Amino acid sequence: MHKITLIRLRGYREWTESLGPRREHIIQTVQAKIHSALWKYFTSIGALPHHLRYDFSLALTTNIETGRVGEVVAKIKRISPVDVEFCEGVGRTPREAYENCGATPGESAGVSVVAHMDVVDSTAATNKNGPLYVYRLIQRTISTIDSGCENLGCLAFYLGGDNIMLLLPNVDAIYQVLRDVELSVRVGVGVAKKPYNAFVKATRGLDYMRVKGRVGVKVVK
């Protein structure tokens, strides 16, 4: 069973509107600070976070105790201009766990499965066509992956550059996701008890594929 924690900045819209029309630079600065804290504190307990709309974020918290999650949220509260709250959900897939957030929680057990993907020859494509071209290419790829994830129960997120992170229900799911991806990609898949350890293993697998100049999937357990 997988566990997802959803983090919400309560009253965030009202706070932004209170700043007046000359506010966007303030909003972006605050969002950057919260995003930095999110990654710093959640990964310190072995969880794997990512922002959604900035007023909402989530974290894969399989095998992480609720008390530890609460401690992290308390740290984020200290730098947030508004209150911060969270809920947890457990499910057979990361998507189902997200959808169950706020329901009666169960125990998460088993392993975390995370993929770290990049696009082959994206640097050459950037040099030829510019960064905006590659950025849009990645966005279209994530959209394609999201469509496949609806049935598989995975969640996909853009990490920057040409990097995509996927929270998977199992190792086999990555091969099903890639059936619809038209680009040549390298993917590291990590399997571990704690989510961030799984991501580290996924990155190790991706680095191996890069060094070897290979295309496809490398699973690291």
UniProtKB/Swiss-Prot annotation:
Its EC number is 3.5.4.29. Coiled coil: none annotated. Keywords: GTP-binding, Hydrolase, Nucleotide-binding. It is an enzyme of class 3 (hydrolase). It catalyses: GTP + 3 H2O = 2-amino-5-formylamino-6-(5-phospho-D-ribosylamino)pyrimidin-4(3H)-one + 2 phosphate + 2 H(+). InterPro entries: GTP_CycHdrlase_3, Nucleotide_cyclase, Rev_trsase/Diguanyl_cyclase. Pfam families: GCH_III. GO terms for biological process: biosynthetic process. GO terms for molecular function: GTP binding; GTP cyclohydrolase IIa activity. It comes from the Archaea. PANTHER family: GTP CYCLOHYDROLASE III (PTHR42202:SF1). Belongs to the archaeal-type GTP cyclohydrolase family. Catalyzes the formation of 2-amino-5-formylamino-6-ribofuranosylamino-4(3H)-pyrimidinone ribonucleotide monophosphate and inorganic phosphate from GTP. Also has an independent pyrophosphate phosphohydrolase activity. This is GTP cyclohydrolase III.
